[in-house]
């Protein structure tokens, strides 16, 4: 295992990152989901968790917000554990689309109708692959899986769920299109409801760092010492995060920062330095690709100072 940075160093770098970017007001909240548009854009929280279970925080790390697309990583992890990694390749795809996260064109352009599990089309299809005889059973298993990563019981932000359910016509169209190509593996209404619910799960910055630390520790939870995933599946999840975690900006992120990462339009980003640490940052203002601007800058700074680039 790679050596984790020392405690005083990590906390000092978190403090520096917070003060360096706390006055950055560039970007704006996601506005196509009304509940997200209302979130205070000034929130800024940073958290790091090491494979040894040490937790370092700065800023608004206890403020709940919706996990949004960061949930896709953990749903992918469960699907891999249940179905095996080759099923993901065969039934979803793992190549970057190079297009927006909610693109329909990505499906049409690929003759195999292959996308990846970290864009909306692939993520909704991944939900349809999960075990569960009905909506209640499938959601119960998925939410329990999230709880294991967070090491606590998580809940759904019902206002976000309602807001997204009322505005998810585009995702429904994606699911119907996938169904027409035999690339969707269950009832559209049922699986779209679960997907929308997973995106509405409430987390804090600290929660996300704890959840991502399982990937930094090769599938073993640093706080419980329990193995949640096989090491092979961890490697594959991190690979997809590297190529598609920040949507059409993923290549630039890999070039600049060099860490597997995943963003969400709620303002969170997680990044993983295998064997060293996981970092999560929350700041609601986004760039045009749907990635938090301050979170990107803060993680870039932290990764550089901790010499964490994996390439």
UniProtKB/Swiss-Prot annotation:
Enzyme class, spelled out: hydrolase
SUPFAM superfamilies the UniProt entry points to: beta-lactamase/transpeptidase-like (SSF56601)
Keywords: Hydrolase
Keyword Transmembrane helix appears in the UniProt entry: no
One of the GO biological process terms: glutamine catabolic process
An example molecular function term from Gene Ontology annotations: glutaminase activity
UniProt keyword Hydrolase present: yes
NCBIfam families hit by this protein: Gln_ase, PRK12356.1
HAMAP family: Glutaminase
Official protein name in the record: Glutaminase
Organism from which the protein derives: Colwellia psychrerythraea (strain 34H / ATCC BAA-681)
Designated gene of the protein: glsA
